[in-house]
Amino acid sequence: MKSRITRMTAALLAAVLSLSLLVGCKPKKELTRYTTIFYDVFDTVTQVIAYCESEEEFNTQMQALHQDLIAYNQLYDIYNDYDGVVNVKTINENAGKAPVQVDDRILSMLELARQMYELTGGKINIAMGSVLGIWHDYREAAEKDASEADNTLPTQEELEAAAQHCDINDLVIDEKAKTVYLSDPEMSLDVGSVGKGYAVEMVCRAAEARGLTSALVSVGGNLRAIGTKPDGSQWTGGVENPWNASEVYTNTNSIFGSPINMSDLALVTSGDYQRYFVVDGKRYHHIIDPDTLWPAAYYNGVTVLCPDSGMADCLTTALFCMPLEEGQKLVESLDGVEAVSYTHLRAHETSLHL
């Protein structure tokens, strides 16, 4: 009897093993390339290239990714209200009045911004909303007027008065209560240097958690790669030519001097050609140097390649406001970060490579 049981057990185990081998050897479905474009988040164009087993899977993934982007866009908005949403605009409206209870996605973004303030010596300062708001208003006025002759600039006195309300220490975060309070009633937050990049990073991580294994997500100047292509090759990123927006550098003699190959990396670019207005024939762009309160004048563009889109977004802005030597020192202190700056006179030569 014992021998019979042993033989039956062995046969059963063999059957189970055979079944598991058959299941394990089942070929993977071939992944197909799909693309989609969104126009309704972060005031820019979002394009996604992804490889999925079916169009149904792709559509499900993209619907979730799109909804995530919309949510982050609404949370980080400083200009618009949304039904049932407490956002950065709400925080600004309550400056000097009362703490505002906020979503965890705001708290974590603000914490990153404070860390980057320390890391960059204040070159990233989301508390500069009062100064950036002045530049925004002048740029908006210029965009509404077809004649450049009527465009004007803020005065130094106007900017310096606003700069008295940019102390990052007046940003009070209570993580336990999940509240944010601006103790200076004249202070306001502007998260343009961190919000989009951080949102892209979080959205891509969420997509990976849902099973997306191969994708390239582009949100304006923020590019984030998820995994590799199905054949194991890396994604290739491009950098917009600051002097010809229709041209994108991707070849071996481009910005980085070699193909910008990406796998689970972020490629972010900031430039003086993205948002600007013209006064007396001179461009005044949107990246404001905290030291001068005027548009930074070191470069035409800065590109950063690193594993985190939120950090890359912050670093492009910070490096844009630093002289070359200072920027090199910062980049060399960071693991896994590559950066390059470029100007009209020295295109692609003032690199900050590690």
Task: Give the predicted meaning of each segment.
Residues 354:
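Cytosolic catalytic cores of cyclic-nucleotide second-messenger enzymes
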Residues 2-12, 16-346, 351:
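Mature catalytic core of soluble alpha/beta enzymes
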